[in-house]
Structure formats: C-alpha cells, structure tokens
Regions:
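Active-site-proximal cap/loop segments of hydrolase catalytic domains
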Residues: 522-629
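Peripheral, non-catalytic segments that deliver or gate enzyme domains
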Residues: 44-45, 50-51, 55-90, 94-149, ...
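Short acidic, Pro/Gly- and aromatic-enriched capping/linker segments at domain boundaries
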Residues: 27-42
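N-terminal secretory signal peptides that target proteins for export/translocation
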Residues: 1-7
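Residue-level detector of anion-binding/catalytic polar loops
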Residues: 519
Length: 629
C-alpha cells in the first residue's frame, strides 16, 4: 500500500499555518480612500474605493495613465504582503515538491473518430505526457495504431505559452480545423492542416474563433468569432470555404446590437452530422433561449437563409440534436428536470411535438447525444452521473455500466456503435473506456498513472438542513482512518449559480491535503443544476441569499458533526464561487479561519459595467433596475 508522501505532523502543521497565517504579520498595506457618491434610485451610497476601478470605470472616457499607475502600485503592494505570508509557510517546499510530482502526471482525452477510408478509421485525441509542457494533438489509424503528432504547441512556440484551444476534424478526416491560444491569452486563432501529411494550409482566422461545423464534403464550415476581440458583444457566425481568404466570409448571423435582446448571449449555431439543418440560438442567461433552423443546402447553393422558427419567447432552454430530418430538443419547457421532444421542422407548431423522453422526478437530464439509432441520455442523480440508452422513439435499451459513483461523459458518433466513456471521481483520476454500445462491453482505453493510492480515501455523501429546512447534499472526502475529533483541517467549497453542478471530480491539488489527514467538503448549493432548473432558480436573483444560507449551514454541519472546528475550517471558491465565499465571510466572519476568494464578483452594484458581465444580469439582476434591489 502506498504511504502518504507528506509526514502527517508536518502536513498538519502546514494546514495550521495556512489557517492562521494572517496573524503572522501586521495588517495589509492601507488603502487610500477617495470620495465617490452614487444616487441609486433615491438612496445615497458612498464608495471610497471607486478609484481602484482605474480607467476601466465607465465614467472615464479616456485612459488615465496616472490613475492606472496608482492602481498598479496598490496591487503590487498587496501582492508583496501576500507573498511574505505565503513564502514563509512551514513545510511549503515539501508541499510544492509533492504538487510538482502530481502535476507531472500526464492527461489524455477521449478521442474523436472520423472515417479514414480503406486504411481504417482515424482517432484524434489530445494528450499531455509527463515531460510535456502542453497537451499535443495526435492521430492514429485504427484503435491500436501508432500515434502521430499533428500539432505540438511547443514546436509552434518554444516559450510553452501556446496551447490548443479546440480542434474539429472534417467528416472524412482529411482536414483538421484547430484553434491556438498564444501567449497565455484566450483569443483563439483558427488554422487548418491536411491530416495525411500534417501540412498547414493558408487559412489563419483570428478573433477568438470557436464552434467550427464542417459541411459533409469538407469543402467549407461555419464558425463563430468576435468581430472586435476587445468587445465580447461582437459575436458573429460566418461561413468559410476552404482555400478562400476569410475576408470574403459572409456574416450569417451576429450579436444583437440594441434593444431588449442586446444582453442575450449569442449567436450560437450548430449543424448535424449530415449538415441538413443549421440551428441558431440566442440565450438569455442560462435558463432560456430562442431557436430557429435553416436549410444548409439552400444557403450553400443560393446564399439565402430560409428561417423556420422553432420556439421563441419561452422561459426555458432548448438544445437541438438533429437526426435525419427531425429535431430532438432537450428542453426544460414544462419540465424543470429536462425532457426530450421530437420536432418536424416542416410542422414546428407545438401541437405536433412528440415527447420522446419524459421528465423524471428524481433525475435531471443533463444532455443527450446520438449513436447509430440510439439516444444516449446523461442523467444526474443526487449530483452523480447515470447514462441510459434509448431508441429514437424513447424505448429503453439499458444503462451504460459505470465504474462507480462519479462524473461521466459518453462521447458518441452518429454512425458508430463505438463510444468512449470518460469517468472520474474525487479520489480517482479521469479514465477513458471504450464502450461497444451493441454488446455493452466496456474496456479500458487510457488511464493516467497517478502516484496516489485511492484505497486510502473514502467518499461520503451527506444531506443537511439549510436555514429554511431545505435538504442540501454535500460530498466529503477524507482518509479512511480519519477520527471525528472536531479538529481536522477542512476545506469547504461550493459554487451555487448558473445551473452549474458540482459533481465528483479528481484534482491532484487536493491529494496532499487528503494524504495529510485533511477533509475536502463540496456542497451542492441551490443555484446549481444538481436538481434541475427549479434548484437553479431557487438560488438566483432575489433568492440568491438561499445560496449563502446553504453554504453557511454546510459549515455549521461540519462543525456540529465534529469533522472540524472554526479554527481549522477554511472555505474556497472562484468566480461565482468567489462571490459565495466573499458573502459568507461578510455574513459569518466568526465561522471560518481562512477564505480563498478567487476572481470573485464582489461589487454587485457595478459588476455589469465590466467585460462581458452584462450577460450575467439574468442571473444576478442589475442595480440599474429598482426591482432587482
């Protein structure tokens, strides 16, 4: 049996240091205050730290270098203070060594399969081997064929700062479209290469490109890009013919510029395997979207778009899956846990819809894919995955066998019985299995060799009562020999927003903490998608306080159940989870001894003025609207 790599006493000393390090030094550098007053619907509000917005503040018409320099100096001083604390932590070097060992473990993704002609199918996949700085895109002919490098980011850029953002082979596997992030940015540039010899073609399309959908003959594709890379509201869907300069690419759809739909997220377009229909969606938040379809062949031959409206103005989501001439819609309309209906674009009125997979009370339908006349339905049951197969009329064909309780994704192809299952849990890294959907046989295809003994740990799911009595699930991960003595160092995390579900996932960064005797707790808060759209909506807009109450109740349960105490309890969250931990700290500073608040939204009166945040107004509301206060 593998032993913990960090000595227990040293590790617990490190945990104690992490939870009390703020007391080592005097407080952080003082922050200058400058008067700023807002009149918010008749209420006067003071904001003495407004100046820290710098030139990004909407009131500032032109860049102010002097102001930005003061903001940078403040940031540098705060970072220097943090570094003095973090660099002085007991056992930090040993922890860094163990983390480096774990990070050296490679990663691999499930392959994308394309027909390769007489020579056999082509399997495209990304893999980062232990010594590689970035994942490399490989192709092999046949499942057991020899792998060949197609794109190595380090060969493109020796600095190691270039990564593969996405890739999409043509249907026949002859051409490959892929995106590269360069210099650490997230503005993917599209390139094309010929798979047979790896030669890059002339195409180079910039503008945060993603969402490539090929025509079946590989002659052209649709793609999404930003017309202005600094403007997240400038999205376009364009059409590109291979070999033609992209300046000639027609704009098929674009972001709404004004009016009530200007805050919708879109356009989002996709096509099916046969490119029969082009589906167009505009989203309002994460809980509703409109949907149209267009005849692809007509557009390609005439340049004309004949619009067929499928649904518009409903407070529900509609995700299309095109199979032949039919649309299979995964929707929350009249089904907050999700269902599937079949729609004939020739008769799109709702009275002609056919229900294929009805809503379930105890399971949330997360998505559905097509595999040679089968529907593969991904369900979430108490925040863990279940995958079931159905024929195209909704008749059950059985469940896909999973290795255990965890998170799973089945990658399917419309014309194949072969699929690939990616499975992971809190203490087991992502493994990939080949699944024969005809026989149900599952065989291991790839598993990273991680220097961790998963048998040391246990995963437990508990349910606790929130402030209003709502039962909330929480996962706990810890060593099997843990004693409930009320003093175990514990990290509690959560998210609670945008219908994002917190399912069991492996993180190498948690391993040293667990090996040392620490506890990882993940709360499945309202606002997430663990129990469908009703669960999401109970944690958004005017009900956002439910999320904070759920999180605080989780911390109280951990203390009351003697997993930990206040002196050994830390909380962590990022983005919307950063808002969560920030609110928890403000509302219950007595309950935690450490808070990791990463890239948070904390100024909820003004967040909507920055970057792409106006897309989040349907989730959070806006202080500009008195009804949202």
């Amino acid at each position: 049996m593998m032993r913990p790599r960090l000595p227990g006493a040293l590790s617990l000393a490190l945990a104690a240091a992490l939870l009390s390090a703020a007391a080592v030094l005097a407080g952080p550098p003082p922050t200058e205050t400058r008067p700023a007053t807002d009149d918010l619907h008749g209420v006067k509000l003071m904001d003495p730290y407004r100046w820290l917005e710098g030139s990004d503040a909407p009131e500032i018409a032109a860049p102010d270098p002097a102001l930005d320099a003061r903001v940078a100096a403040w940031t540098d001083a705060q970072n220097a203070y943090s570094r003095r604390i973090l660099d002085g932590l007991t056992g930090r070097d040993l922890l860094a060594e163990r983390l480096a060992e774990l990070e050296e473990v490679g990663t691999i993704e499930a392959p994308t399969v394309r027909g390769g002609g007489a020579g056999g199918d082509l399997y495209f996949y990304r893999e980062r081997r232990g010594e590689q700085a970035q994942a490399v895109l490989y192709v092999r002919r046949g499942l057991e064929g020899e792998s060949r490098v197609l794109v190595d980011p380090v060969e493109v850029d020796a600095s190691g700062l270039t990564t593969i953002a996405w890739y999409e082979p043509s249907r026949d596997g002859k051409l490959l479209a892929f995106g590269l992030y360069r210099g650490g940015d997230e503005l993917a540039t599209l390139y094309l290469l010929r798979v047979a010899d790896g030669e890059w073609l002339a195409e180079e399309i910039s503008g945060k490109v993603r969402g490539v959908f090929w025509l079946p003959d590989g002659s052209a594709f649709f793609y999404r890009r930003l017309a202005e890379v600094e403007n997240p509201y400038s999205a376009q869907i364009r059409f590109h013919r291979v070999g033609r300069h992209h300046r000639h690419d027609p704009v098929v759809f674009e972001q709404y510029k004004e009016g009530p739909l200007a805050t919708t997220w879109g356009p989002v377009a996709l096509t099916d395997h046969e490119a029969r229909w082009l589906a167009l969606m505009y989203h309002t938040g994460t809980d509703s979207n409109d949907l149209w379809v267009y005849d692809v062949e007509r557009f390609v031959t005439t340049g004309e778009l004949e619009e067929i409206e499928i649904v518009r103005g409903e407070n529900a989501t509609f995700t299309p899956l095109v199979i032949g001439d039919a649309l299979y819609l995964h929707t929350t309309l009249d089904a907050p846990n999700g269902r599937v209906v079949a729609v004939d674009p020739a008769r799109p009125a709702r009275e002609h819809w056919r229900e294929i997979l009805p809503e379930r009370d105890k399971a949330v339908l997360e998505g559905v894919s097509h595999a040679r006349g089968r529907l593969a339905a991904h369900y979430l049951v108490d925040a863990a995955t279940r995958i079931e197969l159905f024929d195209l009329e909704g008749r059950p064909l059985g469940a896909v066998d999973l290795p255990g309780l965890g998170s799973a994704r089945l990658t399917t192809e419309p014309e194949r019985d072969e699929a690939f299952l990616t499975f992971q849990s809190f203490h087991q890294p992502a493994s990939i299995y080949r699944v024969d959907l005809g026989s149900g046989e599952r065989t291991l295809w790839a598993r990273p060799e991680v220097p961790v003994d998963p048998t040391l740990f246990t995963v437990r799911q508990v349910f606790y009562a929130s402030k209003d009595g709502t039962q909330v699930p929480m996962f706990l991960v810890y060593r099997k020999d843990l004693e409930l003595d009320g003093g175990n160092p514990t990290i509690l995390s959560g998210y609670g927003g945008f219908s994002v579900s917190q399912t069991p996932r492996f993180s190498s960064r948690n391993v040293p903490w667990l090996e040392a005797g620490g506890v990882i707790a993940v709360a499945n808060l309202r606002g997430g998608g663990e129990y469908g759209e009703a669960w999401h909506r109970s944690g958004m807009l005017e009900r956002k306080q439910n999320v904070f109450d759920d999180f605080i109740a989780a911390a109280e349960w951990l203390v009351a159940s003697r997993y930990t105490d206040v002196a050994h309890l830390g909380v962590a969250g990022g983005s919307n989870g950063g808002l969560l931990t920030g609110a928890a700290l403000v509302q219950r500073p007595d309950l935690f001894s450490a808070v990791f608040c990463a890239v948070p939204l904390l100024d909820m009166l003004r967040y909507q003025y920055f970057l792409m945040a106006r897309f989040w107004v349907p989730e959070y509301g806006s202080a500009e609207d008195p009804e949202h206060l």
